[in-house]
Amino acid sequence: MRLAAFVLVAVAFAIIPDGRVSAAALGPPESSEGTHEKARLLRLNAVPQPVETGNQEERTINFASIKKIVPGTSAFKNAQALKASQKAALKAQDAAKRKAAVDKWFKQFESDEFLFTAAFPSWVRKKMHPDKVREYFASLGKSGDDVSMIVKRYDNYRQTIPTKK
C-alpha cells in the first residue's frame, strides 16, 4: 500500500515539473544515444532530490499562536489560578484550625494535676511504654521539648509506682 503511494508520488514529481504530460511522456523514452536502460537512468537522475534537513516526520503544529488569537484563554487561565489560590487558602485555614485545636488540647498536659491524676494512671493501665506515649503525641502533631519533658516525667512516674504481684 505504501509502496504504491510512493510510486505514484514519485511519478507525479517526475512528470509534473517536466511539463510534458502526454501519452508519449508515459511511454518508453526516446533517446538517440545509448540503450533504453541508460536513457531511463539519465531521466531518473534528472529528478530533483529533496534536501534532507533532519527528521521532517517529527514536526508538530505550534498552537501557541492560536491560543493568542482565541478569546477567553487568558480568562480561563486566570480562573484556574484563582481556583488554585482559593484551594491553597482553604488548606492553610484548615491547617491553622487543626493546629489551634491541638494546642488547646495540649494545654491540659501542662498541668501537673491533670498529668498525675488522669494521664499517667490511664497510660499505666494501658501499659503504654514511654516511646508509645511519644508516638501518640507525634501522631497528633506535637513534638519537641514539651513532649520530651512529659515522657520523662511519665517514665519516672511509671518506675516509682509499686507493681502489684
From Swiss-Prot:
Induction field: Expression is induced during host plant infection.
Signal peptide stretch: 1-23
Keywords of this entry: Secreted, Signal, Virulence
Intervals of motif RxLR-dEER: 40-59
GO cellular component, one term: host cell
Places the protein is found: Secreted; Host cell
Chief localisation class: secreted
Domain description: The RxLR-dEER motif acts to carry the protein into the host cell cytoplasm through binding to cell surface phosphatidylinositol-3-phosphate.
Protein function: Effector that is involved in host plant infection. Contributes to virulence during the early infection stage, by inhibiting plant defense responses induced by both PAMP-triggered immunity (PTI) and effector-triggered immunity (ETI).
Family: Belongs to the RxLR effector family.
Protein name: RxLR effector protein CRE12
